[in-house]
């Protein structure tokens, strides 16, 4: 299996904190003791709190994951990630982070409460099926009804983008290919990408991105798209 983890269940709950990690280029799934399932993206890390399923259904994410949560109104499922808190209200949703501190949440069904925990008592924003929320620089921006099948394509082994910021693409390439996409032109760096990849080599991905941006693309050995 692609996932590396240490788990100890006791009486239907976690006896100790557990960490699940996926290597670059490989995704995997795990079922939590409450019946919720998680698809963990490549190069990602999920920490499950000790005592999970004993009134405390909290996890911490670095990277990206898709959560299919078994609803329990008395014990909400909470994801912590880069200063963000995503609280389930009976939901399936994805969470993705990037190196710029951006946390993006896409809801496929149900409702989540999304808030910035670095802002003290900031009120949560409610996201419903089809909604997208992005936390960056202390601000949560919401777009309603914009989530599509492309947002979850990575759970099926495909990277699909529609007007995606390059920071999101860069984070995915680190996780899936272990490469660093460098955009040395400030104007190009502000552009977005619409493209999809399945089974492409790192060199092919770089060339497609370079063409889409109207730039010269160097292969992974050179480490840049200029």
Predicted regions and their residues:
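A residue-level detector for the "anchor" residue at the start of short, highly conserved motifs
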Residues: 2-226
């Amino acid at each position: 299996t692609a996932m590396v983890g240490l788990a100890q269940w006791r009486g239907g709950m976690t006896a100790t904190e557990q960490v699940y990690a996926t290597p670059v280029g490989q995704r995997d799934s795990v079922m939590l003791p409450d019946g919720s399932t998680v698809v963990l993206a490549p190069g990602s890390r999920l920490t499950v709190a000790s005592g999970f399923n004993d009134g405390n259904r909290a996890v911490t994410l670095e990277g990206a994951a898709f959560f299919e949560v078994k609803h329990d109104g008395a014990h909400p499922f909470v994801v912590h990630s880069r200063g963000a808190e995503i609280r389930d209200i009976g939901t399936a949703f994805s969470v993705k982070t990037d190196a710029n501190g951006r946390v993006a949440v896409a809801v496929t069904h149900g409702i989540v409460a999304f808030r910035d925990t670095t802002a003290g008592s900031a009120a949560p924003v409610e996201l419903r099926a089809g909604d997208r929320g992005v936390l960056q620089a202390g601000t949560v921006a919401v777009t309603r009804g914009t989530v599509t099948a492309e947002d979850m394509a990575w759970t099926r082994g495909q990277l699909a983008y529609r007007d995606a910021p390059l920071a999101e693409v860069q984070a995915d390439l680190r996780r899936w290919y272990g490469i660093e996409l460098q955009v040395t032109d400030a104007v190009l760096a502000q552009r977005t990408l619409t493209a999809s990849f399945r089974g492409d080599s790192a060199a092919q991905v770089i060339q497609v991105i370079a063409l889409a941006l109207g730039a010269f693309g160097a292969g992974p050995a050179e480490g840049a798209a200029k």
